[in-house]
Structure formats: C-alpha cells, structure tokens
C-alpha cells in the first residue's frame, strides 16, 4: 500500500490504532515501524524482515548504481560500504528471455564496477532464511575485513 501510494505512513498507523482488540493487531503494531514504501514487492518486505531477524545491517532500498558506461541500474537491496547488493528474483518477473538477458547484463555490469550481487528466490526468504542471512553476513564480513 505504501509503495503504490494508496496511503501515507500516518494513515497506516491510524488504521492500525482503530483495530484495538483484533486478533494479531499487537504483532502488526510491532512490525509497522519496518514498513517502507520503497519495497516494490511483498517478498522484498519479507526479505527485509529476515535481515532484521538475522541481525544484519539494514540495506539501502532501491539503490541506484551507475556503471562504467553511464547506465543507471537500480537494485533491491544494497550495502554500499561493502559494495554488496541482493536482488529478489521472482519467477514471474524474471522468467522471460528478455528479463533473463537484462538480469545477466545487470549482474555483469555491476561486477565490472566492483559490486557483488547475491540473488534471492522465494525459498531463500521463506524456507531457508538462516542460510540467506549467513550468505549475506559472510559477504559483509569479508568486505569489512578487506576494508579494515
């Protein structure tokens, strides 16, 4: 709702406060602080919750990177200090030949600029969240050790 600009954060909070006594509303109140209109899909929001639960540094959302040819690329999640990105790849959005070409070009161009890209699919987020956190944490730790 926030991404589609159907409501503002204040509207969301007001609606939540009007739900006093409803089952599950306490959990909703705890999670609303993590709502971010920059998430472009429900799975991106779920992935952010996995990152939070896993104790990862919060990434920049919808981060823009300009490659060596001047082309602008936007990534789902970025940790700029570590030159690390993570991209959620849904089967619906990324399954066509055109989308596959675009994704491969994007990863190649980002790698040419020194970025590491971690792909994520629904199973990473929903079935193996600890493995996903470990993969990202390993890359973040490696980048920190190189910088230090």
Labelled PLM ranges:
Residues 2-148:
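Surface segments flanking catalytic/ligand-binding clefts of nucleic-acid enzymes
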């Amino acid at each position: 709702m926030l991404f589609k600009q159907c409501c503002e954060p204040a509207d969301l909070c007001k609606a939540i406060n009007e739900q006093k006594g409803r089952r599950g509303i306490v959990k909703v109140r705890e999670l609303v602080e993590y709502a971010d209109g920059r998430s472009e899909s429900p799975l991106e929001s779920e992935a952010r919750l996995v990152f939070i639960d896993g104790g990862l540094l919060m990434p920049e959302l919808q981060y823009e990177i300009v490659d060596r040819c001047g082309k602008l690329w936007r990534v789902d999640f970025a940790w700029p200090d570590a030159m690390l990105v993570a991209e959620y790849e849904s089967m619906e959005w990324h399954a066509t030949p055109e989308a596959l070409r675009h994704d491969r070009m994007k990863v190649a161009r980002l790698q040419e600029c020194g970025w590491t890209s971690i792909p994520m699919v629904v199973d990473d987020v929903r079935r193996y969240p600890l493995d996903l956190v470990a993969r990202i944490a390993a890359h973040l730790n490696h980048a920190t050790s190189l910088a230090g």
